[in-house]
C-alpha cells in the first residue's frame, strides 16, 4: 500500500472522474483540476458528442466505483449492427448470441456528470475552470490559472487524465523524451442528428448501431435515451469524391446523401443545417514509448494512448486503466513502483486495442455487407458452439470479456486464419470440412482462460 495517500489528477473528464472516485473510496486524498467549467452548472462542453459504446470492460470499472446503476439508467442497448446496404433492406448482424452479449450507447456528457458527482460523494475535491499552466517536476509544484489569476500548488504525484491534447503530457515532454508519435487518419468525421419521431418515438430501430457501409466512407448512427440518434459521417478529408473537400456545404451534402444514403435522408430533416454548422473532426492514434516520469507523473486514457473510435473501446480501455492504476497504487509502497507496474501491464494492451480499432474501421466500412464476411461470421458463431473454451469470436473477447486486449489480438489473428482457410473457395456452410476445421482449431488454439464453463 502506498503510504503517501495523496494524489493530484489533471482532468475531470471520464477517466479523471472515475479514477478520483476509485481512489477516494479507498481513502486517498484526491484533488482534481479541470480546465472546463462544471458541467452540472454550465452544461457539458467537451467539444465532442460522439456517443460512447459501453462494454463489459467499462461496466466492470463502473461496478468497482458503484456507479453502474446510475449509468445504466441512461444507457440504450445495442444488440448489433443494423447494416443499411446501398440497395436492399437493412439487416441486423448481432454482436453476440443473445441479449446477454450486447453493448450500450451512452451520452458522454451525462456519463461525465454521474462520475463527477460520484467523485465528490467519495470525498475527492474537484476544482473547475482551472487550467494547468506549468509543472516544476524538481520542486513538485504546478501552476493552474483560473478566474484571472494564477495559483501555485504542490503535489505528491500527478496523474494526467486530460485527454488526447494533454497539457500534462506536454509538460512531461519538456523534461523527458516520451517518444510521442501521432498518426493522423486521412478520414475525418462530421456529426448530424436524427430527431425523435411523432409522439417522441425513435424513428428507426433503437437497439442497434446503424451503419451505412460504402467502401472508403460510411455513416453510423447511435441511439440516445432522449429518442434521438447521433449520426456520424466518416469519409476522407480530401481527394476524389466523396470527401469533405468535394462535399463542402449543405447543398452538396443533400445531393450526396440522396444518392448514397437515400434511406437516411428523411430521418435527418436538418441535414443541410447540421452539415454546415458542425465542424469536421480529425482522428488520430497517439503512441508513446513511456507514460510516466519515475514516480512523479503518469498518464492514463487518451492522454497516454488516444485511438480511433471504430471499436468503441476508447472509454472502456481508459476505464480499465483507472482500475489498474488504482490497484497498483494500493499494491505498491512507492509511486514509482506503482506507476512502473501500471505502465508494464497496460501499455501492450493499449497498443493492441489501438491496432484493432484501426482494423475495425476497414471492417465496418468495407466488409460488413460482403458475402465472404457474412459466411465467416456465421462459421465463427458455429465454431464458438463447437469449441466454447477455445474459439471465442473476436468481438466477444474484446467487448464481452475482460481478457487482456493483447491476448484477444493474438487469438483473433489465429482465428482469422482458421476462418479464411475453412471458407476458401466455398459459398455455403454445408460445404465446410468440419473434421479439418475442428483439427485446425484444436492444433492452433489452447484453452482460453475465463471462458464460461
Q: Language-model segments: what does each one mean?
A:
Residues 2-6, 54-193, 250, 434, ...:
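Conserved N-terminal helical subregion
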Residues 3-5, 327-453:
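C-terminal helical "tail/cap" subdomain of flavin- and related membrane-associated enzymes
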Residues 10-21, 25, 159-160, 192, ...:
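Conserved mid-domain beta->alpha element of the FAD-binding
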Residues 15, 38, 165:
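Conserved Rossmann-like nucleotide-cofactor binding loop
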Residues 24-46:
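Glycine-rich FAD pyrophosphate-binding loop
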Residues 32-33, 127, 160, 300:
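Generic enzyme active-site microenvironment
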Residues 73-77, 259-276, 334-341, 350-355:
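Acidic/histidine metal-binding catalytic segments
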Residues 117, 121, 130-134, 139-280, ...:
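Conserved FAD-binding catalytic core of PHBH/FMO-like flavoproteins
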Amino acid at each position: 500500500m502506498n503510504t503517501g495517500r495523496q494524489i493530484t489528477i489533471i482532468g475531470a473528464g471520464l477517466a479523471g472522474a472515475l479514477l478520483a472516485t476509485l481512489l477516494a473510496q479507498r481513502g486517498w486524498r484526491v484533488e482534481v483540476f479541470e480546465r472546463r467549467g462544471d458541467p452540472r452548472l454550465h452544461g457539458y462542453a467537451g467539444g465532442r458528442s460522439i456517443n460512447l459504446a459501453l462494454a463489459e470492460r467499462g461496466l466492470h470499472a463502473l461496478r468497482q466505483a458503484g456507479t453502474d446503476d446510475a449509468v445504466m439508467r441512461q444507457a440504450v442497448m445495442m444488440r448489433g449492427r443494423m447494416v443499411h446496404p446501398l440497395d436492399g433492406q437493412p439487416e441486423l448482424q448481432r454482436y453476440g448470441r443473445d441479449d446477454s452479449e450486447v453493448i450500450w450507447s451512452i451520452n458522454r456528457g451525462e456519463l461525465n456528470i454521474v462520475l463527477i458527482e460520484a467523485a465528490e460523494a467519495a470525498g475527492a475535491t474537484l476544482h473547475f475552470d482551472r487550467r494547468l499552466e506549468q509543472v516544476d517536476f524538481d520542486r513538485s509544484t504546478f501552476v493552474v490559472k483560473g478566474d484571472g489569476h494564477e495559483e501555485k500548488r504542490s503535489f505528491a504525484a500527478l496523474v494526467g487524465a486530460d485527454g488526447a491534447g494533454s497539457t500534462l503530457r506536454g509538460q512531461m515532454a519538456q523534461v523527458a523524451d516520451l517518444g510521442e508519435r501521432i498518426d493522423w487518419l486521412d478520414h475525418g468525421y462530421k456529426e448530424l442528428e436524427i430527431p425523435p419521431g411523432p409522439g417522441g418515438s425513435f424513428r428507426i430501430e433503437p437497439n442497434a448501431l446503424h451503419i451505412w457501409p460504402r467502401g472508403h466512407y460510411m455513416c453510423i448512427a447511435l441511439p440516445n435515451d432522449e429518442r434521438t440518434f447521433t449520426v456520424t459521417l466518416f469519409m476522407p478529408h480530401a481527394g476524389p469524391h466523396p470527401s469533405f473537400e468535394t462535399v463542402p456545404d449543405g447543398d452538396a451534402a443533400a445531393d450526396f446523401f440522396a444518392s448514397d444514403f437515400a434511406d437516411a435522408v428523411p430521418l435527418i430533416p436538418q441535414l443541410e443545417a447540421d452539415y454546415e454548422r458542425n465542424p469536421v473532426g480529425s482522428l488520430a492514434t497517439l503512441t508513446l514509448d513511456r507514460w510516466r516520469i519515475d514516480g512523479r507523473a503518469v498518464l492514463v486514457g487518451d492522454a497516454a494512448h488516444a485511438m480511433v473510435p471504430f471499436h468503441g473501446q476508447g472509454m472502456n480501455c481508459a476505464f480499465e486503466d483507472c482500475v489498474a492504476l488504482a490497484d497498483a497504487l494500493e499494491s505498491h509502497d512507492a509511486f514509482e513502483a506503482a506507476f512502473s507496474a501500471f505502465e508494464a501491464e497496460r501499455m501492450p494492451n493499449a497498443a493492441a486495442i489501438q491496432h484493432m480499432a484501426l482494423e475495425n474501421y476497414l471492417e465496418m466500412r468495407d466488409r460488413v455487407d460482403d458475402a465472404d464476411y457474412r459466411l465467416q461470421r456465421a462459421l465463427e458463431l458455429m465454431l464458438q458452439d463447437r469449441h466454447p473454451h477455445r474459439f471465442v469470436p473476436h468481438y466477444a473477447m474484446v467487448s464481452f470479456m475482460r481478457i487482456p486486449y493483447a491476448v484477444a489480438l493474438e487469438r483473433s489473428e489465429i482465428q482469422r486464419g482458421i476462418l479464411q482457410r475453412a471458407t476458401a473457395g466455398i459459398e455455403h456452410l454445408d460445404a465446410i470440412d468440419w473434421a479439418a476445421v475442428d483439427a485446425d482449431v484444436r492444433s492452433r488454439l489452447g484453452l482460453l482462460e475465463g471462458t464460461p464453463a
